[in-house]
């Protein structure tokens, strides 16, 4: 299976979660073992030159790709979560969304100097969530090696925003 073959497993759901939004549903891709394996293999191949020490991902769908990619790369996994979900001491970052603000947290001992972290999520839209995740990793003294996504929303400026950080930005498909 090739990267373009994955498109058939991404379902568009119009007007979800709100009117005018097209939600990209990846559950058909997750259900198909060949498509799922191909996605993980292609992501691993794309980032193989980065020499990362861990993969960090934002809940919830980022965990799917982050966890499997960390396993495939043979490195650790770092969860980045919404407030109140992590049991140990945390560092947090407030960031802007299209219509408001949100907060992400990471355990304060999740990474540190000398670590090279790959940030993974399912969709790259504005880049706000990924940049907040990168800011958290940097706050811990670790380096962000790059970013990896399944989908890039071509009508949004997230790729340009993250590219300005001077890190590699990988994605498999533009929708």
UniProtKB/Swiss-Prot annotation:
Pfam family name, one: Pribosyltran
Biological process per Gene Ontology, one example term: adenine salvage
Coiled-coil stretches: none
Record-annotated disulphide pairs: none
UniProt catalytic activity: AMP + diphosphate = 5-phospho-alpha-D-ribose 1-diphosphate + adenine
A single GO molecular function term of this UniProt record: AMP binding
Gene Ontology cellular component terms for the protein in this record: cytoplasm
Main location: cytoplasm
InterPro entries: Ade_phspho_trans, PRibTrfase_dom, PRTase-like, UPRTase/APRTase
EC number in record: 2.4.2.7
HAMAP family: Aden_phosphoribosyltr (MF_00004)
NCBIfam families tied to this protein: apt, PRK02304.1-3, PRK02304.1-5
Role noted for this protein: Catalyzes a salvage reaction resulting in the formation of AMP, that is energically less costly than de novo synthesis.
Family recorded in the similarity comment: Belongs to the purine/pyrimidine phosphoribosyltransferase family.
Protein known as: Adenine phosphoribosyltransferase
UniProt source species: Coprothermobacter proteolyticus (strain ATCC 35245 / DSM 5265 / OCM 4 / BT)
Lineage, uppermost ranks: Bacteria, Pseudomonadati, Coprothermobacterota, Coprothermobacteria, Coprothermobacterales
Protein encoded by which gene: apt
